From Swiss-Prot:
Gene3D superfamilies: 3.30.60.80, 3.40.1360.10, 6.10.250.240, RecR Domain 1. This is Recombination protein RecR. It comes from Arthrobacter sp. (strain FB24). Keywords: DNA damage, DNA recombination, DNA repair, Metal-binding, Zinc, Zinc-finger. May play a role in DNA repair. It seems to be involved in an RecBC-independent recombinational process of DNA repair. It may act with RecF and RecO. NCBIfam families: recR. Belongs to the RecR family. The gene is recR. One of its GO terms (molecular function) is DNA binding.
């Protein structure tokens, strides 16, 4: 264990998601050895993002304005909303260039072990968006893990009573994958999500 400022830096870096003790130590020593101007730019970038970036008042995506660029874009279809867990998921969907609707960022997923229930997510804001009657379909695009599935099921059951079409992203076998290596859940989902071979 180091002393003083070095250990404090390692500890703070270790609090970042996905950064373990070894990575935190490597990052800390990289910072110590880096050019001071590079570190000044890093500090300025972090400070700027904390000062200027906020969440879109409509969808919850990151933005520097009141509304994000997707909510401001009149070419987007306002009748379809893709519900995702985090802002980074918006970017992942956008990279596909397959979706031209709008988004709703929940800010996480239901995770009782971590103390995250529906009330900690932006579900109330989603329901508010549905009040105007313009939305015809909700696409649930949560992660295909336990928390994402719990969140998707919760949303689907809740939205079913409203009478809006609720769909879930298909999941199954990856392109180029081998059946023999697929786990049972993935293979089962592939069967459930099968479609006409000629469509």
């Amino acid at each position: 264990m180091y002393e003083g400022a070095v250990q404090e830096l390692i500890d703070e870096l270790g609090r970042l998601p996905g950064v373990g003790p070894k990575s935190a130590q490597r990052l800390a020593f990289h910072i110590l050895e880096a050019d001071p101007q590079d570190m000044k730019r890093l500090v300025e970038a972090i400070t700027t993002v904390k000062e200027r970036v906020k969440f879109c008042t409509v969808c919850g995506n990151v933005t520097e304005q009141e509304l994000c660029n997707i909510c401001r874009d009149p070419r987007r279809d306002p009748s379809i909303i893709c519900v995702v867990e985090e802002s980074k998921d918006v970017l992942a969907v956008e990279r596909t260039r397959s979706f031209r609707g709008r988004y709703h960022v929940l800010g996480g997923a239901i995770n009782p072990i971590a103390g995250v229930g529906p009330e900690q997510l932006r579900i109330r804001e989603l329901l508010t968006r549905l009040n105007d009657g313009a939305i015809q379909e909700i696409i649930i695009a949560t992660d295909p893990n336990l928390e994402g599935e719990a969140t998707a099921t919760y949303l689907a059951r809740m939205l079913k009573s409203i009478g809006i079409t609720v769909t879930r992203l298909a999941s199954g076998l990856p392109v180029g994958g081998d059946l023999e290596y697929a786990d049972e859940v993935t293979l089962g989902r592939a069967f459930e999500g099968r479609r006409n071979a000629l469509s």
